[in-house]
Amino acid sequence: MLFARRLEQLKDLNRIRNFSIIAHIDHGKSTLADRFIQICGGLTEREMSSQVLDSMDIERERGITIKAQCVSLNYTATDGKTYLLNFIDTPGHVDFSYEVSRSLAACEGAILVVDAAQGVEAQTLAVCYTAIDQSLTVLPVLNKIDLPQAEPERVISEIEDIIGLDAQDAIRVSAKSGLGVNDVLEALVANIPPPKGDVHAPLQALIIDSWFDSYLGVVSLVRIVNGSIRKGDKMRVMSTGRAYEVDQVGIFTPKRTKLDALYAGEVGYVVAGIKEIQGAPVGDTLTLDRNPADKVLPGFQRVKPQVYAGLFPVSSDDFEAFREALAKLSLNDASLFYEPESSEALGFGFRCGFLGMLHMEIIQERLEREYNLDLISTAPTVVYQIVTQKGETLLIDNPSHLPPTPQIKEMYEPIVRANILVPQDYLGPIITLCVERRGVQVSMTYSGRHVSVVYDIPMSEVVSDFFDRLKSVSRGYASLDYNFQRFQIADLVKMDILINSERVDALAVIVHRDSAHSRGKLIAEKMQQLIPRQMFDVAIQAAIGSHIIARQTVKALRKNVTAKCYGGDVTRKRKLLEKQKAGKKRMKQVGHVEIPQEAFMAVFQTDKKK
């Protein structure tokens, strides 16, 4: 059998180690995970591929981890004992921080991977603090030690100064070549505490993740805190009280491997033929029907979406398939929020909430690839707080739902606290960018070559292309982490886009009054380039209320109707031109302008001059 000494380990919880790998994007988490699998024999050389845990095509193409993946491995340490290692490879991007906090809840320790050339970055900091808050043992590891530009001594002092961890004994590795990886495994066994739990107590299992399988139904990734669960048991989902018979339990090695039972301290999967998509929500507790636990395990704090956008199927026939696809995806991604929405321009669709712009791109790409849907997305917006003249407080995530201007007393916009870590050489351009985006400096701290700059910036300025601009002005060296701080009063207006004098509800945006003119002009210019020419002039206007602030015209395609007139009277030519003019006028009244997807995205991409 795969785990010959498994039962012996499980009777002795001291032989189990549960840990996560945390790091900034591109610091080598997934490569280090590959080496662990190779050393512990999880896969043969033939089955190995790079980024073996990044199972989605999008993850491999973009070189990022989106979904946390769990693997159980056997490792024989130098003390001669065989340990069961359950580890979770987590995402590094700020948009997927919720995925990281869920993974950490199932662990007793974490490996903090830091690039020996690039050093500590803002997201490393954020994730590391989450791990420390959850009382995990954090092991610092310096990766890419074989690079000529690696500076381990500088990075060790950065870890100590910026994060506050003792990093003198940080293990130096090269995940690519495998150098020092065995030392990491030994340090894990020696330093990370074993799980606490009682195999004989009533079952308490925390659902870390769930996804929908077309054949098996809902598959739940669980951490068994107390008790045990085996095939044939009747389990109960504690939030709903519904009971299901367990069809299959097992672990990932990283291949899905069936087992007879899962015991306290283990991380594995449970299949119970749950067909309804919300049957086993993430963060819920599973127990046994015959001997239930008294208490529900503390779950996860629900995360609030930061960015909202409308998603609409190009063909209205796909609406039901789209609804089903969103339901399946929201099971796998608990941070995705959606509700039905209708638009005059785009028909029926859904208003979706995301954690950030990358999250939104990934969700749209997954829906299109995995469920073969053709979608149009509207410009993303954040949540605004409105106080009406009657004293009511409203939260608005869609500009077309904004009350008429006379009814609005005050408008508040969300402010985020952005923590930017940047080398001193690029500090000037970063400050300029933050001021451009209406940022207010909170603090600035120098540590070694890096500066930690903290700004309060309106969220609407951050969620557009702030991250890309930050990377471009700092040549990729700056890193960003941000979280919601408060709502702040602001002079905001709703800007409508009119195509041939018709308001297109899906193109409306809420902007700051000071930047409305420049923003309206930019959007109109961009739309002029993107909307294809018609047989009649197309007027593109940006308006605040009834006041037009910008206009561009897409000139008509023109047929030379006088070409057939050779010589002859000028009145003949004039008659043909008048006839053409009348035809174009009539066409303009009934003509329909197709707006391409790029035009919807132009509304938010033209945020400021590039």
UniProtKB/Swiss-Prot annotation:
<dbReference type="InterPro" id="IPR038363">
    <property type="entry name" value="LepA_C_sf"/>
</dbReference>
<dbReference type="InterPro" id="IPR004161">
    <property type="entry name" value="EFTu-like_2"/>
</dbReference>
<dbReference type="Pfam" id="PF03144">
    <property type="entry name" value="GTP_EFTU_D2"/>
</dbReference>
<dbReference type="GO" id="GO:0005525">
    <property type="term" value="F:GTP binding"/>
</dbReference>
<dbReference type="GO" id="GO:0003924">
    <property type="term" value="F:GTPase activity"/>
</dbReference>
<feature type="domain" description="tr-type G">
    <location>
        <begin position="14"/>
        <end position="196"/>
    </location>
</feature>
<comment type="similarity">
    <text>Belongs to the TRAFAC class translation factor GTPase superfamily. Classic translation factor GTPase family. LepA subfamily.</text>
</comment>
<comment type="function">
    <text>Required for accurate and efficient protein synthesis under certain stress conditions. May act as a fidelity factor of the translation reaction, by catalyzing a one-codon backward translocation of tRNAs on improperly translocated ribosomes. Back-translocation proceeds from a post-translocation (POST) complex to a pre-translocation (PRE) complex, thus giving elongation factor G a second chance to translocate the tRNAs correctly. Binds to ribosomes in a GTP-dependent manner.</text>
</comment>
<dbReference type="InterPro" id="IPR006297">
    <property type="entry name" value="EF-4"/>
</dbReference>
<dbReference type="InterPro" id="IPR035654">
    <property type="entry name" value="LepA_IV"/>
</dbReference>
<dbReference type="GO" id="GO:0045727">
    <property type="term" value="P:positive regulation of translation"/>
</dbReference>
<dbReference type="InterPro" id="IPR000795">
    <property type="entry name" value="T_Tr_GTP-bd_dom"/>
</dbReference>
<feature type="binding site">
    <location>
        <begin position="26"/>
        <end position="31"/>
    </location>
    <ligand>
        <name>GTP</name>
    </ligand>
</feature>
<feature type="binding site">
    <location>
        <begin position="143"/>
        <end position="146"/>
    </location>
    <ligand>
        <name>GTP</name>
    </ligand>
</feature>
<dbReference type="InterPro" id="IPR005225">
    <property type="entry name" value="Small_GTP-bd"/>
</dbReference>
<dbReference type="Pfam" id="PF06421">
    <property type="entry name" value="LepA_C"/>
</dbReference>
<keyword id="KW-0997">Cell inner membrane</keyword>
<keyword id="KW-1003">Cell membrane</keyword>
<dbReference type="InterPro" id="IPR000640">
    <property type="entry name" value="EFG_V-like"/>
</dbReference>
<dbReference type="Pfam" id="PF00009">
    <property type="entry name" value="GTP_EFTU"/>
</dbReference>
<dbReference type="GO" id="GO:0043022">
    <property type="term" value="F:ribosome binding"/>
</dbReference>
<keyword id="KW-0342">GTP-binding</keyword>
<keyword id="KW-0648">Protein biosynthesis</keyword>
<dbReference type="GO" id="GO:0003746">
    <property type="term" value="F:translation elongation factor activity"/>
</dbReference>
<dbReference type="Pfam" id="PF00679">
    <property type="entry name" value="EFG_C"/>
</dbReference>
<dbReference type="InterPro" id="IPR031157">
    <property type="entry name" value="G_TR_CS"/>
</dbReference>
<protein>
    <recommendedName>
        <fullName>Elongation factor 4</fullName>
        <ecNumber>3.6.5.n1</ecNumber>
    </recommendedName>
</protein>
<dbReference type="InterPro" id="IPR013842">
    <property type="entry name" value="LepA_CTD"/>
</dbReference>
<dbReference type="GO" id="GO:0097216">
    <property type="term" value="F:guanosine tetraphosphate binding"/>
</dbReference>
<keyword id="KW-0547">Nucleotide-binding</keyword>
<dbReference type="InterPro" id="IPR035647">
    <property type="entry name" value="EFG_III/V"/>
</dbReference>
<keyword id="KW-0472">Membrane</keyword>
<dbReference type="InterPro" id="IPR027417">
    <property type="entry name" value="P-loop_NTPase"/>
</dbReference>
<keyword id="KW-0378">Hydrolase</keyword>
<dbReference type="GO" id="GO:0005886">
    <property type="term" value="C:plasma membrane"/>
</dbReference>
